[in-house]
């Protein structure tokens, strides 16, 4: 079987996007390996999974969280997730409870050469760089995720779908370089540990909750550096690294682009769901969003602001989102897909808010998602009339 060179420096968006993911996943599911030129890593052989509930995972009217919540009590955080985003609950991350549960520390702890201190800082033992990552959940680093999984275990009925998230290789690579690793080693190890966590979490959910679909997001706040020309590695290398992380997953995947991050790079890596802030800056990427929707992709609209007061009503965020949709439609996006192929989330994590504020932001997102679901039902009735 011949594959187009998806790692070629001149590969365009049509190759580097959804086509890339189809190729990568077909390679993996065939039980073969392919070495990626930019970082010299091999996508490992993984077992072929039987068809599950994932094909019907995404439906109009879903809301979820980005990840972080302000709570110190993991059970309380999980209760908020289950109550405010019941159709797509998310595993909370609790950095205020412990710096070890910060978005860098909780994932790099799987690297044998990394020591995470109580304050979340990293130190490197370079003699252990050649050792494989060993992902394992522990109460110090993953209290929110462990409490979430326990709540699902004891629930009388599991949700149809859940969302988990892992910090991506670009963001982890920058952190590892700052901790003292050479750039090439830092990003190579970041890719290895991100892929290891993706496989570990998916296998865990599949084994424990086989009837529950998984949406697995890769969080990449560092994408803002590529948007503003401050990239630590080349664009094509970054696409290779992020695409390789997505490719080891058999579940539905997403990439969260925080704030003014590079949505074009995220799209080029080929996620099923593209998470962006629902602001006027999204109009600069209208062509990318159009291609993503045309390829049957979904968008997670970060429509509830996290950098200013939300207000008591859904009306303000809803009007802003509808206005954005209208302008995107004028710029070529399909008017039905732009409304119905979307989730609603807060713009970013909620760890910096009070507990009541965080719950309120999730509640606003849920009410907005309900409106999208109602519109989708109305559209189907109109078509069938």
Q: Where do the protein language model's features map onto the residues?
A:
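A short, acidic, amphipathic alpha-helical segment used as a generic capping/interface helix at domain edges
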Residues: 283-291, 313-337
